[in-house]
Curated annotation (Swiss-Prot):
Gene that encodes the chain: BAS1
Main location: plastid
Places the protein is found: Plastid, Chloroplast
Induction statement: Down-regulated under highly reduced cellular thiol pool conditions. Down-regulated by ascorbate. Slightly induced by oxidative stress.
Residues annotated as domain Thioredoxin: 73-232
The name this protein goes by in its record: 2-Cys peroxiredoxin BAS1, chloroplastic
EC nos: 1.11.1.24
GO CC annotations on file: apoplast; chloroplast; chloroplast envelope; chloroplast stroma; cytosol; stromule; thylakoid
Keywords carried by this UniProt record: Antioxidant, Chloroplast, Disulfide bond, Oxidoreductase, Peroxidase, Plastid, Redox-active center, Transit peptide
Amino acid sequence: MASVASSTTLISSPSSRVFPAKSSLSSPSVSFLRTLSSPSASASLRSGFARRSSLSSTSRRSFAVKAQADDLPLVGNKAPDFEAEAVFDQEFIKVKLSDYIGKKYVILFFYPLDFTFVCPTEITAFSDRHSEFEKLNTEVLGVSVDSVFSHLAWVQTDRKSGGLGDLNYPLISDVTKSISKSFGVLIHDQGIALRGLFIIDKEGVIQHSTINNLGIGRSVDETMRTLQALQYIQENPDEVCPAGWKPGEKSMKPDPKLSKEYFSAI
């Protein structure tokens, strides 16, 4: 975990965003990447996924899995907490994941490095759609192993020059690599993170995760759709969402007989 000794206080804003107090640091310096290679395999996360999960047995069958290994970043487990420095609105702040519990959903995504190629296309795409995530009571957090100084230099670089421009959410600095490691996305021999993305609900539980190799960008549309489906089934626990489900479309009852209502309509 990336621990910080100083205490934090939340900042109130018109959009009710949960960011801790700003910290003061010196002027930025820039780190540039010249080459980036893809790993042959990532064993750190796969080893934990060998464990099988079990459905809870109640009077009404639950289709929400509770993972058995609490120390792994598995769907159904609590997300590993962290506190770290970040850049937001061209200033330095502290972000603590557990501050969002009981308040917001979180889209937490990892990317390899600043000043690279696929990364700015993803980061700016999430920023451009941030107002849609806000309407779903969701905060977006980006993470890489770069310093806050590198993050700041990148947001101060124009998009047409490969920069980010102003972003609508924080970029977190994981210089110790502890956050990437705790979420199982760290490529140990390269010291950078795979493109991991986690949807964390208001209880701090991981409800969705994807991991892409370095050369494959992620879809904001699919992230949004998955988030909407998650929120729907949490509000309607007697229903499940079929493939490609979008808000307004027909859901399904997870029952051998009642599900026929859905299948007969398609």
